[in-house]
Amino acid sequence: MKVWYGAPEAAREHYEAQVVDAEIAGGARAFAVEIGFHAEHPKESENAAALARLCEREARWRPELGEDAVAGAFLGRGSWRRVSETWPDPDLDDPDLAFDIGVRLVEYIRVLEPLR
């Protein structure tokens, strides 16, 4: 699931909840769900700038997103950047899983979007 804000060129910066392979998600045996913000511009410098803007304001978002939020290189693609967290091997039989993912994604949007 992806959520975009702003002009079409801003689509390279978005919020996303996605399944990622265990090989790139630390602590997972089968897979993980990644939730958060992504900067996926073709130029690494643009991604670094997007992340730098958020890192400059980390004192404002860290208390709300917590220590699980990682600001750094994108999982599986070093030129992209992220502020996101992973949930290793979530229980797919949990009837609240989709709701919990959606709520957490909205928390990232609510906290980070005003700072971008």
Can you say where each PLM-predicted feature lies in the sequence?
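Polyanion-binding interface signature
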Residues: 1-80
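Short, intrinsically disordered low-complexity segments
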Residues: 71-97
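Ampiphathic alpha-helical segments that act as solvent-exposed interaction surfaces
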Residues: 52-65, 88-116
